[in-house]
Design a protein with these regions (language model features):
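Nucleotide-state-sensitive switch-loop elements of NTP-binding domains
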Residues: 2-15, 20-137
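Conserved catalytic-core segment of NTP-binding enzymes
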Residues: 116-219
């Protein structure tokens, strides 16, 4: 894989929980880049994707079908996704060689919804480093609905930190689909990300409210 100046294009891995909007971001990024006349290479590494709305230069579904993995190994969707990730990682060099000859300014990679594949599986770490070739970073997408509670927001902070720690790549957190949130909710979430004291207070309040709810239920 080489860009127009002969160097390896930087690689941007899009990571996040299922439904956070990874494929939507890749689609929008590709359209935005084309508008600016930037040559972006979109890569799909999700073998379980039913459809994508971007134009992938490489699609892992051409190598591995999640439904075939489920049938062959008698696995459910989650187990098949994990095994499929291991199978893709075992072919990481072959995948890299297939996209190596593509010229572009940047490569953006759509990843499976199971964020634990990046947080806890060595296979995904191997795949990321082979494809990244030392010129990679991560975008971790925060789900807007999960982010609307202090505990949900912190849970995603922890997941992002684990992925960053495991892969050792520069990581940026972004709140996805923020247009779905009410303005006051969006403002509150952004404040949590900027002021840990405010976030801590919100966590204590949430915990106290939950304790009161549980206690009330027990008395009933």
């Amino acid at each position: 894989m080489s860009s127009n100046d002969g160097t390896t294009p930087p690689v941007l891995f899009v990571v996040g929980t299922a439904g956070a909007g990874k494929s939507s971001l890749v689609t929008s990024f590709q359209r935005w880049a084309r508008f600016l006349d930037i040559d972006v290479l979109a890569i799909n590494l999700d073998p379980g994707a039913e459809r994508v709305h971007y134009d992938p230069e490489f699609d892992v579904r051409d190598l591995i079908s999640l439904s075939e993995v489920m049938d062959e190994y008698d696995l459910g969707p989650n187990g098949a996704q994990i095994l499929a990730a291991d199978l893709v990682a075992s072919q990481a060099v072959e995948v890299f060689e297939e996209i190596e000859g593509l010229a572009g300014d940047i490569m953006i990679v759509d990843t499976p919804g199971q964020v634990e594949l990046f947080a806890f599986r060595e296979a995904s770490s191997h795949l990321v480093h082979v494809l990244g070739q030392g010129r990679a970073c991560l975008i971790f997408l925060f789900d807007p609905l999960l982010s609307s509670t202090p505990s949900g927001f912190v849970s995603q902070m922890l997941l992002s930190s684990i992925v960053h720690f495991r892969l050792g790549l520069p990581t940026a957190n972004f709140l996805s689909k923020s247009d779905l949130l009410e303005p006051e909710t969006l403002e509150r979430i952004l404040e949590w990300g900027e002021n840990l004291d405010v976030l801590e207070a919100a966590l204590f309040e949430e915990s106290a409210n939950q304790a009161g709810f549980d206690g009330g239920g027990q008395r009933a």
